[in-house]
Amino acid sequence: MARAVSRCPWPPVDDPIYLKYHDEEWGVPVHDDRTIFEFLVLEAFQAGLSWRTVLYKRPAFRQAFASFDARRVARFGARDIHRLLRNAGIIRNRQKVVAAINNANRFLEVQQEFGTFAKYMWSWVGHRPVRHRWRTLRDYPPYTEDAVAWAKDLKRRGFSFLGPTVVYAHMQAVGMVNDHTVDCFRYRVLARGIPIRNTRRDRGRGGEATGR
């Protein structure tokens, strides 16, 4: 009899797309700028909605946003905005569409300054993943001090729709933090060679801790 796989408590066991994301992507360190930009776009669009909604619309987002090529997205104009707002395959929110285009331009500025966005991004955790030891869904904070500090710098640089909660979700997604629960099989895979770091959690005002 096959032994049941132990996972984090948040991915629905009857949702193959969600499980695939948890098992193969979430928390894996990302150093590729295009993939980083993809997650920044998706995280900003997810704000206020479920991540499941974004996952199921991800292929449509990829097509609508030029395969997440920041240089191409940065050149989007009024006609592109109109096109995106008529695209039923994505989340049609004008503010978020405009924010994605703005963020593409800011993304390019960071690349120009640091060489790659990844180099800038990873500097916020000392260029190596932070390994937490969450045991239950209640342990997850909505954001940490690192997320607050980075969100503040992103705002200073002109990024939008990237507050501390969204930024922390991004940090979890791209592996800046290993936030799989300690009993999850992915925690052990991703934790190899990474020391545990005690991180001060900031639950904000009435924030409710969640995983993904």
Question: What label would you give each PLM region?
Answer:
Residues 1-212:
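HhH-family (HhH-GPD) DNA N-glycosylase catalytic core used in base-excision repair
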